[in-house]
């Protein structure tokens, strides 16, 4: 996008001086992507962004989707993007993404326009109470008054600096800056002026932020590591469970911890360890499916569990750990919030994962190699993998487990993976090919909603400046059809598994009740060919595993976005999962 020549202090009126200061300070702090939804009251923000030479503006008509796209950038880049919207219900559309960002610790800047004080609570058009509208789901919020010659413009700079500090410091999360504007909203000359103090003038001639904050970092590991090391010293029957890990360094450290202890490592899809780790003797990529065997569960209760990183998707694993009642269950993560839905955690180490692992390894002797305990877990996982691979190779029909395994086998190394909530994240966590290539995997598992998934994938592509493979269900895609507009300029290959409704409910007890159909199956009878055409996306509808391989490879080679629709049957899908898990259980127990 072409920009006009930029001088931050060259503003036609006080409103534009403030918005230009705000945008410049955000850019200096590393915010370069602004997701802008159209609106009138936000005109001063939008124009300031459009004119800034280093601000990339992404336009999207759906405020909810734009907010999820900003969330996606934060997930991929671990730094915030800004969401910009006008006043009124437009602001409320940011709540779902703010909730997800808050619960899962994703940095994000909510930049909203508002009416001035004299129009609040007066019945003025498009005016609602936006102060603290996001409640406790934001780490910090500011209600910025209209520009005035009685307020030092340095206030704008220090507010921006504080917002960026609050969104990045542990625990990371969204912040809300609510900006009141009076008319005129357009960049027109007015008689009003704001004096520029010497300090702001000096700042304008430089390139550094006005207020420097230290790089936010979690506390270094302290005495709690000594206590934890003492409790697990000499333990052979332990497990390392890898939840969501946000960096390669954290993933490498977690792998090193398992190797040092000689403990099996059960990785979540979002741990950066679920795929590409087949040669690691401690790796148990099919841990969820191994636990289908009651005999294996009963014979392999861990005495100690080291859970590293954020949440993991497997309910089966969580219940196994709960029922095993380990003497030690420690969570190691750079966040003070608890992950303990079953109230079994005995230790919480709040520290950066690499630092915590270094501290633990330094305090613990190297564990034995080739123990029966480790080999039992790894061997069971290998046998499960053989069953899954046989299903992929022998099936002539497209099934949900096959799609998950096939995509992760074929995924190019430059692609990241995005898994929608509901069945896609579960199928990928269970059936993904462990030896496949590809980049990190992402999923909105903070609040686990299905909304905004397409927009999140687009934001991840934007944030990592690289292609994305998205696996999504039909209801989640219907929920975010507008998000397909964001795929026109960002390479996202979206594979939608269309089983005509809510397939996950076939796995829940409600299926035995009369109200199951249609209240939970929610059949809709639609396909997505016309949706792809509406947004000018190439469309494929493969009818066999070989056709899916071909369509996916073609879409990836193109370097552009595409929509691939895979039709499956909900009832058959449940039967396929049951048969596959029965085969898995036999394979585990026959070992």
Swiss-Prot record:
Q: According to its UniProt record, which cofactors does this protein need? A: Mg(2+); Mn(2+); thiamine diphosphate
Q: Name one GO molecular function term.
A: thiamine pyrophosphate binding
Q: In which pathway does it act?
A: Quinol/quinone metabolism; 1,4-dihydroxy-2-naphthoate biosynthesis; 1,4-dihydroxy-2-naphthoate from chorismate: step 2/7; Quinol/quinone metabolism; menaquinone biosynthesis
Judged by the first EC level, this protein's enzyme class is: transferase
> How and how many cofactors are bound, per the record note?
Binds 1 thiamine pyrophosphate per subunit.
* Keywords for this protein: Magnesium, Manganese, Menaquinone biosynthesis, Metal-binding, Thiamine pyrophosphate, Transferase
One Pfam family per UniProt: TPP_enzyme_M_2
Which GO terms of type biological process are on file? Answer: menaquinone biosynthetic process
- Complexes and interactors: Homodimer.
- PANTHER family linked: 2-SUCCINYL-5-ENOLPYRUVYL-6-HYDROXY-3-CYCLOHEXENE-1-CARBOXYLATE SYNTHASE (PTHR42916), PROTEIN PHYLLO, CHLOROPLASTIC (PTHR42916:SF1)
> So what family is this one in?
Belongs to the TPP enzyme family. MenD subfamily.
Q: What does this protein do?
A: Catalyzes the thiamine diphosphate-dependent decarboxylation of 2-oxoglutarate and the subsequent addition of the resulting succinic semialdehyde-thiamine pyrophosphate anion to isochorismate to yield 2-succinyl-5-enolpyruvyl-6-hydroxy-3-cyclohexene-1-carboxylate (SEPHCHC).
Q: What name is this protein filed under?
A: 2-succinyl-5-enolpyruvyl-6-hydroxy-3-cyclohexene-1-carboxylate synthase
């Amino acid at each position: 996008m072409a920009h006009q020549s930029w001088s931050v202090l060259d503003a036609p009126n006080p409103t534009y001086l403030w918005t230009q200061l705000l945008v410049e300070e955000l850019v200096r702090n590393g915010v370069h992507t602004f997701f802008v939804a159209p609106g009138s009251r936000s005109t001063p923000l939008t124009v300031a962004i459009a004119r800034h030479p280093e601000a990339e503006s992404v336009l999207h008509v759906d405020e909810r989707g734009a907010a999820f796209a900003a969330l996606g950038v934060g997930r991929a880049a671990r730094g915030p993007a800004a969401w910009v919207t006008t006043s009124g219900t437009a602001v409320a559309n940011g709540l779902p993404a703010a909730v997800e960002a808050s619960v899962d610790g994703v940095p994000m800047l909510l930049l909203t326009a508002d009416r001035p004080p004299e129009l609040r609570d007066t019945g003025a058009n498009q005016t609602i109470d936006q102060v603290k509208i996001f409640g406790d789901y934001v780490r910090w919020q500011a209600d910025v008054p209209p520009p005035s010659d009685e307020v030092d413009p340095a206030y704008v700079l220090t507010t921006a600096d504080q917002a960026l500090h609050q969104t990045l410091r542990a625990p990371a999360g969204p912040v809300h800056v609510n900006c009141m504007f009076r008319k005129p909203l357009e960049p027109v000359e007015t008689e009003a002026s704001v004096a520029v103090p010497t300090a702001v003038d000096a700042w304008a001639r430089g390139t550094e932020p006005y207020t420097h904050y230290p790089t936010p970092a979690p506390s270094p590991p302290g005495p709690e590591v000594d206590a934890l090391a003492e409790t697990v010293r000499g333990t052979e029957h332990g497990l390392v469970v890898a939840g969501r890990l946000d960096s390669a360094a954290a993933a490498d450290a977690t792998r090193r911890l398992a190797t040092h202890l000689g403990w099996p490592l059960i990785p979540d899809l979002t741990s950066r360890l679920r795929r590409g780790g087949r040669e690691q003797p401690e790796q148990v990529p099919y841990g969820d499916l191994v636990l289908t065997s009651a005999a294996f569960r009963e014979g392999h209760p861990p005495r100690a569990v080291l859970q590293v990183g954020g949440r993991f998707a497997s309910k089966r694993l969580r219940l196994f750990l709960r029922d095993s009642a380990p003497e030690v269950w420690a969570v190691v993560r750079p966040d003070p919030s608890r992950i303990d839905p079953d109230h079994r955690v005995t230790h919480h180490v709040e520290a950066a994962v690499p630092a915590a692992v270094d501290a633990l390894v330094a305090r613990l002797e190297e564990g034995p190699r080739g123990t029966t305990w480790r080999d039992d877990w790894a061997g069971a996982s290998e046998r499960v993998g053989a069953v899954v691979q046989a299903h992929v190779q022998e099936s002539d029909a497209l099934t949900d487990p096959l799609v998950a395994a096939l995509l992760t086998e074929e995924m190019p190394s430059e692609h990241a993976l995005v898994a929608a909530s509901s069945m896609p994240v579960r199928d990928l966590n269970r059936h993904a090919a462990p030896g496949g290539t590809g980049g990190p995997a992402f999923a909105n598992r903070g609040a686990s909603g299905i909304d905004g998934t397409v927009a999140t994938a687009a934001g991840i592509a934007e944030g990592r400046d690289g292609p994305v493979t998205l696996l999504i269900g039909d209801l989640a895609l219907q929920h975010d059809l507008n998000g397909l507009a964001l795929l026109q300029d960002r390479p996202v290959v979206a594979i939608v598994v269309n089983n005509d409704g809510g397939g996950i409910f076939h796995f829940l007890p409600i299926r035995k009740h009369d109200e199951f159909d249609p209240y939970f199956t929610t059949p809709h009878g639609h396909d997505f060919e016309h949706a792809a055409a509406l947004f000018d996306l190439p469309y494929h509808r493969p009818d066999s595993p070989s056709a899916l391989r071909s369509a996916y490879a073609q879409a990836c080679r193109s370097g552009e976005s595409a929509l691939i629709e895979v039709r499956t049957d909900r009832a058959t899908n449940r039967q396929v999962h049951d048969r596959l898990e029965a085969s898995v259980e036999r394979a585990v127990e026959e070992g």
